[in-house]
Amino acid sequence: MTIAIGKSSKEPKGLFDSMDDWLRRDRFVFVGWSGLLLFPCAYFALGGWFTGTTFVTSWYTHGLASSYLEGCNFLTAAVSTPANSLAHSLLLLWGPEAQGDFTRWCQLGGLWTFVALHGAFGLIGFMLRQFELARSVQLRPYNAIAFSGPIAVFVSVFLIYPLGQSGWFFAPSFGVAAIFRFILFFQGFHNWTLNPFHMMGVAGVLGAALLCAIHGATVENTLFEDGDGANTFRAFNPTQSEETYSMVTANRFWSQIFGVAFSNKRWLHFFMLFVPVTGLWMSAIGVVGLALNLRAYDFVSQEIRAAEDPEFETFYTKNILLNEGIRAWMAAQDQPHENLVFPEEVLPRGNAL
């Protein structure tokens, strides 16, 4: 037996290496360096939202009831934005507004900035998690790139838009009915549905749903090797490693249907990635434009003719009148501190009335 005498080549690990080993260890739920950002931020964002929707009123900021404690349900409860008078204050618990008083902080809308900022960083942490895991198992980072779409929409709607306006007050509150109110606000004040970036976003999201349905149906339709079950679901074997559908058959089918078809899987799946992500990014760019009060399409000639000719009206001019109605009613209700009063004779009416 030979015994080697000398200094061991195994150096003691430093703090960074020890942390790296522990964070990236193979476990049921991967943590990773990204988890240091993801898990605390996601915990605080969700915890803040559940706390706000359960206990916290919006009486002091919006004049509304917004919690389960006040009688709201899942669809009407919300964590509401701070008051318009607080502008873009971060509303830190220890800041000059709340001065360390937790109850006062909740009343002022501090939970909204808390949830919005932790939510944004939590989403970024989730994207970094996908980068980190992809690198660990030697995958391309397209999952993380795809997730940049939802992040862009969240950041543009909840952070960039109110930063371009007079305060956090004009961002969406975190609730189902609150988001619906925000959509109506966007339509009335920005004519959002006629914005080309919104159109591209709708085309991307609905187009992606169509592609997903077509792709799933085509793969199911072209299975050439299945199990012995009576139907696809009974015959499905999740441990089967080999591919059992025919790309050639699918290509021939869609070539006959449309005259064109995807010739390889890489282009097909890249297209399924490209359509929704591009749509979401276009929507986000459009919202950034709205933050700067950029206008959508204006067909002024139709508006002038409709004003001059009582018998001329288009769907566009009717929608413009609807937008005026939304502004007239919503501004007075949504901003009571402005004391807006509109006389009956200035409220919009269609030419048919």
UniProtKB/Swiss-Prot annotation:
- Where in the cell? Plastid, Chloroplast thylakoid membrane
Q: Look at the named UniProt entry and state the broad enzyme category this protein falls under.
A: oxidoreductase
Which annotated residues bind pheophytin a? 130, 143
Q: Which InterPro entries match?
A: D1/D2, Photo_II_D1/D2_sf, Photo_RC_L/M, Photo_RC_L/M_CS, PSII_PsbD/D2
Q: Name one GO biological process term.
A: photosynthetic electron transport in photosystem II
Note the SUPFAM superfamilies from the entry: Bacterial photosystem II reaction centre, L and M subunits
Task: Provide the residue positions that the database annotates as binding chlorophyll a ChlzD2.
Answer: 118
Q: Where chlorophyll a PD2 is bound, by residue?
A: 198
PTM comment: the record says:
Phosphorylated on threonine residue(s); phosphorylation increases with increasing light levels.
GO terms for MF: chlorophyll binding; electron transporter, transferring electrons within the cyclic electron transport pathway of photosynthesis activity; iron ion binding; oxygen evolving activity
- Can you state the subunit structure given in the record? PSII is composed of 1 copy each of membrane proteins PsbA, PsbB, PsbC, PsbD, PsbE, PsbF, PsbH, PsbI, PsbJ, PsbK, PsbL, PsbM, PsbT, PsbX, PsbY, PsbZ, Psb30/Ycf12, at least 3 peripheral proteins of the oxygen-evolving complex and a large number of cofactors. It forms dimeric complexes.
Miscellaneous note of the record: 2 of the reaction center chlorophylls (ChlD1 and ChlD2) are entirely coordinated by water.
- In Swiss-Prot or TrEMBL terms, this protein is called Photosystem II D2 protein
